[in-house]
Amino acid sequence: MSSVFITGSSSIKDLPNDVITSLENIIDKGFEIFVGDAKGVDTLIQQYFYKRNYTNINICTIYETPRYLASNKFKIIQVDYDKNLFGEREKQTYKDEFMTLNSNYSFVIWDGKSKGSFENIKRAIISNKKLKVFYTLENRFLEKELLNIENITNLYKQNTGYTQTEIYNKIKESKIYTNINKANEIKKWLIDNDILKIYNDKLSINQKYKNYFIVENYRGNENIKYKANSAKLKSAQQSI
C-alpha cells in the first residue's frame, strides 16, 4: 500500500482548492496517511479527512496524547526522541523524520517561510522520496524541476532573508566589497553608505534600498534581515 506524509506550515488557515483536489485523489487511491499533531496544516488535514470519514490515517506525536486529534478512529503513533533535547523544534524533528522515512510520498503545503516545512522538503529530496509542494504565496504547485535543494533554499531565503553571517559569506564568495573582513562590519558599512540609518537608537532602512531587506517583528522588536543575492549586492554598490 502506498503512503503519504502530509505536512505544512502552521500559519496556513485554509486548504487551497488545488490541495483539496489532491486530497480527494489520495482518498480515491486509498493511500495510508501520516500527519502530525500541530496547529495549521496538520489540524486542517485531520479535520478534512474526519469530515470525509477517511480513517486510514496515522497521527504521529512525540507525546503520550497528541496535541490535536480530530477523531478517535485515527491511529496514534508515539515517536521516540532524544530525551536530552530541550528545544521543541529539535524534538519534533524526530517525528518528522519518522513520517518521511515511513512513507513513499511527501506532500508539503508551504508558505515559503516555515523552517519546519522547508526542512521536510529538503529531507524528502535527500531521501529520494516522491515529492509534491504546494506554494501558498503563489497559490500553485511547484514544478518538479524546481524541487532540488538549491532552488528550494533560494526560495526560502528569498522569503525569510539572510542573517548577517550568511550575507557576509555570500559577499566573500562573490568577491564584492572586499574591504569588509568580518560579518559584524556589514552593519557599519551599510550605515556609513546611508543604506541603513539610526534614529533615536532605532535602525531603519533607506527607502531607496527597501527591496534589499526584510523587516521582521518579533515580540515588539524589529529585526532586519538581508534579502540581497549577489546581483542585487553589486547593483546596490554601483548605485552608491
Regions picked out by a protein language model, each given a short descriptive name:
Residues 132-163, 173:
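Phosphate/pyrophosphate-recognition segments in soluble nucleotide-handling domains
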Residues 12-147:
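Acidic/glycine-enriched connector segments
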Residues 1-5, 96-109, 162-170:
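Long, low-complexity, intrinsically disordered polar/charged segments
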Residues 153-166, 170-177, 184-187, 191-240:
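Positively charged, aromatic-accented nucleic-acid-binding surfaces
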Residues 1-2, 145-149, 235-240:
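Short, Lys/Arg-enriched, disordered terminal segments
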Residues 2-10, 35-36:
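Short, hydrophobic/glycine-enriched beta-strand segments
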